């Protein structure tokens, strides 16, 4: 049987792409290696009676256009905003809480000057976030096209981009450029004097970024994490009722209703090439499937290094993938709790327990964590962000009990000295629990069960090469027209008939649906 399009990988972007193609009348097949759709955006039971978002764990970047076009709310998706964005408990018993209408007063506890500067800082970031929101649903200019008429679309796109940037004054254009090149610490030093305040905001610069907040380029990662929105509120974060898998299931329902076929337990072994063109796939079970368009919703490194033979990949692409930087320093845990944690800095229940709880009191602490991971393999004083989604969603745990997501950094994607993650996973998990215990005594005793995912587990389970949650670092040389490489930023792969729609394409990582949407538009133009 032949298809108009086959999508490799049933993660949320692959499902979005399938839905748009099927709605346009195309015959579409999605192939997912695992037994469940959603890729890293899945909800599973990890301890009897306890369910949680296994890998990706929070909502902000999901594109409103995708939600509206695919009518995801009508397909069961319900997202609730967090009452507070972030909570930063400090070892000395103080704390900072970032929440609508409350952040400035919280900042004033540490610095009146910083509190006065905060509105201008937020307004400035919002200007740049609006730029990113506009770019997120646009195909980057293809800087790899040679001259002549073929270059006209790229030249038009570049001209449009230039005209839009010209609406910003020169100082804002300079500052936007700085955000792509400066470290998060350098950028925050321009605005604030208080270390806890810089830690509260600077944490966004190292989320999924195996780097220090002093690493050049980390300011962009900070910006990447503030351009989202939730239920129409810019910069807000939320929770999908039922976990992140509810997003994938709503998209899958939309795709099925449009006519797409979705298959699980259907791992792709290799691509089929005929006369230099990608024409189909061979599955792990030996089945051969053909299509006019093959769309890869996988890390580009996995695509070009594992699904194609070296001689089938153009030299420039092979070289680029050899240097494609993967590894986000991420160690992921889900824990079942008998009760809510009780923080020394802010005892008792409250909105802070529904926030992102950041256990990393300063930029210097984050810097030491990164340096220690590079030397030791993992930070002995790690960075832990904890979310307790059951405070907003009682479907995840038994009455009176809770689940928590622990997003932990920094850990080396590959351990030094020949050590193996399978031998050290539980030791590092104990360290992460102990880190939370320092801020919330009694936490360790409340843990009823846990799920532990090292970088190697994230790669084996979800295809996240090096455990990289973004399918490749969000560094300046791996963004926009260079994501995944010059000449392929327009969602067309290295060979005719091959397309890309995963997080290794523009606009980068996160549960956005943007890549699936834009890749579908390119495929529809070509078919």
Describe the role of every protein-language-model region.
Residues 239-241, 260, 267-397:
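Mid-domain catalytic core of redox enzymes
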Residues 503-524:
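A conserved FAD-binding loop/helix module that cradles the flavin
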Residues 1-36, 40-41, 107-113, 167-172, ...:
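Structural core of flavin- and non-heme-iron oxidoreductases
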Residues 2-148, 474, 518:
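N-terminal glycine-rich phosphate/pyrophosphate-binding loop and immediately adjacent elements
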Residues 194, 198-214, 377-389, 438, ...:
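A glycine-rich dinucleotide-binding beta-alpha-beta segment and adjacent secondary-structure elements
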Residues 108, 245, 301-306, 338, ...:
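Conserved FAD/dinucleotide-binding core of flavoprotein oxidoreductases
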Residues 126-258, 464-478:
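Active-site/ligand-binding neighborhood in enzyme catalytic cores
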Residues 1-5, 23-24, 479-481, 485-486, ...:
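Extreme N-terminal leader/targeting segments of oxidoreductases
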């Amino acid at each position: 049987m032949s298809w108009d399009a086959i999508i490799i990988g049933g993660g949320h972007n692959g499902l979005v792409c399938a839905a748009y193609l099927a709605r346009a009348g195309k015959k579409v097949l999605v192939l997912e290696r695992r037994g469940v759709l959603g890729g890293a955006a899945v909800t599973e039971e990890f301890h009897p009676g306890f369910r949680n978002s296994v890998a990706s764990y929070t909502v902000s970047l999901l594109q409103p256009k995708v939600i509206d076009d695919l009518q995801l709310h009508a397909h069961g998706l319900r997202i609730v905003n967090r009452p507070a964005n972030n909570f930063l408990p400090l070892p000395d018993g103080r704390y900072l809480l970032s929440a609508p209408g409350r952040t400035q007063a919280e900042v004033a506890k540490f610095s009146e000057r910083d509190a006065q500067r905060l509105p201008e800082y937020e307004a400035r970031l919002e200007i740049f976030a609006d730029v990113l929101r506009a770019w997120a649903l646009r195909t980057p200019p293809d800087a790899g096209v040679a001259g002549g008429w073929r270059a006209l679309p790229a030249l038009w796109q570049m001209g449009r981009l230039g005209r839009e940037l010209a609406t910003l004054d020169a100082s804002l254009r300079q500052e936007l450029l700085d955000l792509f090149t400066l470290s998060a610490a350098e950028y925050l030093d321009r605005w604030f004097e208080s270390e806890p305040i810089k830690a509260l905001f600077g944490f966004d610069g190292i989320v999924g970024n195996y780097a220090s907040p002093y690493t050049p380029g980390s300011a962009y990662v900070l910006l990447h994490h503030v351009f989202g929105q939730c239920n129409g509120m810019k910069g807000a974060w939320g929770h999908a009722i039922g976990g992140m898998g509810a997003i994938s299931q709503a998209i899958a329902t939309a795709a099925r209703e449009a006519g797409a076929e979705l298959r699980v337990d259907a791992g792709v072994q290799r691509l089929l090439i005929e006369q230099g063109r990608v024409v189909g796939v061979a599955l792990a079970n030996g089945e051969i499937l053909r299509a006019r368009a093959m769309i890869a919703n996988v890390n580009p490194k996995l695509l070009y290094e594992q699904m194609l033979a070296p001689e089938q990949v153009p030299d420039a692409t092979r070289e680029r993938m050899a240097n494609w930087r993967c590894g986000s320093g991420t160690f992921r845990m889900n824990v079942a709790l008998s009760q809510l944690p009780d923080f020394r800095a802010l005892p008792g229940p409250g909105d802070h327990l529904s926030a992102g709880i950041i256990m990393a009191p300063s930029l210097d602490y984050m810097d030491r964590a990164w340096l220690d991971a590079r030397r030791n393999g993992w930070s002995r004083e790690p960075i832990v962000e904890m979310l307790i989604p059951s405070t907003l969603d009682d479907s995840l745990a038994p009455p009176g009990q809770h689940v928590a997501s622990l997003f932990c950094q920094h850990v080396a994607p590959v351990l030094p000295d020949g050590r193996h993650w399978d031998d050290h996973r539980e030791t590092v998990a104990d360290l992460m629990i102990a880190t939370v215990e320092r801020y919330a005594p009694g936490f360790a005793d409340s843990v009823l069960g846990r799920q532990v995912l090292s970088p190697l587990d994230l790669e084996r389970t979800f295809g996240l090469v090096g455990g990289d949650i973004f399918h490749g670092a969000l560094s300046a040389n791996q963004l926009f027209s260079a994501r995944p490489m010059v000449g392929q930023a327009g969602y067309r792969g290295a060979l005719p008939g091959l397309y890309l729609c995963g997080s290794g394409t523009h606009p980068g990582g996160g549960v956005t649906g943007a890549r699936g949407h834009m890749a579908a538009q390119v495929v529809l133009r070509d078919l």
